[in-house]
């Protein structure tokens, strides 16, 4: 049996980022063989990551990066189980690594990015932190030529909301202001005509039921439905919204003044669409006490 020294444990900790006891145990089981200990820890990391994969990861961060010439940008979301881990330096380092990978490979989706080199670091982070970690999604906006337009981004100070926007005409300041507006107001689409037909149908049915309950004449009911639907479409369409920094003008008017047009936007909010598990703290404590 090899003697496991403090310097060996220290080296393994530095190479893996894992805790002292995990490293000491791995070296003991590997009979002091550093490389075998690392290999065993990597295998254990994969098993641990697989076991935790079913746990809901709905916290985390969003990050963006824009090319120097402004013709390309990327936004990603990386999830953890708790907000505490989302502020951990190791988690943030992995998120930055994922961002750089997504920026470098302009065609890769999440699966391709993981297969290309992120899955190993992800599993190692799961092993180190003890939570499920996911690269959830990635999106990119670009122009073939920088003269065609600009791509800009805005990330809210808490790193929970990020917006990527592509603009023809205007400048970076305008693009960033509109991205900030999108982060705050959360429009569904750019233009009224972009609202999906199924959404319009659903809203129309709701307004119809509400209006008919009023007992008003049919012609009045139809006008009520039409008016409410127009109002809804305006509220969810970016161009028709009052500009958040100057509510006296609409976003479309701001763009017209600058001779600019919005091509596309992407808005990510951490955890949106993920069904979070409801924790019963009292029941959890009771279970631990009875166990």
Where are the regions that the model predicts?
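N-terminal assembly/interaction segments in proteins that build large macromolecular machines
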Residues: 2-291
């Amino acid at each position: 049996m090899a003697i496991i020294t403090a310097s060996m444990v220290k080296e393994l900790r530095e190479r893996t980022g894992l805790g002292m006891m995990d490293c000491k145990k791995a070296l003991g089981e590997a009979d002091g063989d550093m490389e075998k200990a690392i290999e065993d820890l990597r295998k254990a990391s994969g098993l641990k990551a697989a076991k935790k994969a079913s746990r809901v990861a709905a916290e985390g961060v969003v990050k963006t990066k824009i090319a120097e010439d402004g013709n390309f940008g990327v936004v990603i979301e990386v999830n953890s189980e708790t907000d505490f881990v989302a502020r951990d330096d190791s988690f943030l380092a992995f998120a930055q690594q994922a961002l750089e990978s997504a920026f470098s490979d302009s065609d890769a989706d999440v699966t391709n990015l993981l297969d290309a080199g992120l899955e190993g670091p992800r599993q190692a982070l799961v092993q180190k932190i003890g939570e499920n970690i996911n690269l959830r999604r990635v999106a990119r906006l670009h122009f073939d030529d920088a003269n065609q337009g600009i791509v800009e981004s805005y990330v809210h100070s808490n790193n929970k909301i990020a917006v990527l926007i592509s603009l023809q005409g205007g400048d970076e300041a305008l693009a960033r202001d509109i991205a900030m507006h999108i982060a705050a107001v959360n429009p569904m689409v750019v233009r009224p005509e972009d609202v999906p037909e199924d959404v319009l149908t659903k809203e129309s049915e709701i307004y119809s039921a509400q209006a008919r309950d009023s007992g008003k004449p049919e012609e009045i009911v139809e006008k009520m439905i039409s008016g409410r639907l127009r109002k809804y479409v305006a509220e969810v369409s970016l161009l028709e919204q009052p500009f958040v920094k100057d509510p006296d003008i609409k976003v479309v008017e701001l763009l017209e003044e600058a001779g600019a047009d919005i091509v596309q936007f992407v808005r990510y909010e951490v955890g949106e669409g993920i069904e979070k598990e409801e924790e019963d703290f009292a029941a959890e404590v009771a279970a631990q006490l009875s166990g």
